[in-house]
């Protein structure tokens, strides 16, 4: 099978559907996708369980690696920054302002890696009421 995105590294901090769906499409095309999740809770879709596991989580996060990092902690933010320095793409689908509070806003990440493609997916834009 052709893997046109082989060699592309993606950091995926998306939750539920829009962020993870973007990441899984890139993974299916050969990109190395690293899912970054909060320690202890992870992606909220993990809690949408069937019998033994969450089929929703499995569907949208196949072919990905996973790491737990709390970017509010200095040591975890430093580890995240190392990943950013080697990444080609960053995906998030937070509400407006959340990425900045977590230390993963576009200005900061592009300062670490100017060639980074920053994908901020919103349901209502950065200026919408939600």
Question: What would you call each of these model-derived segments?
Answer:
Residues 1-130:
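N-terminal helix-loop segment corresponding to the beta1-alpha1 unit
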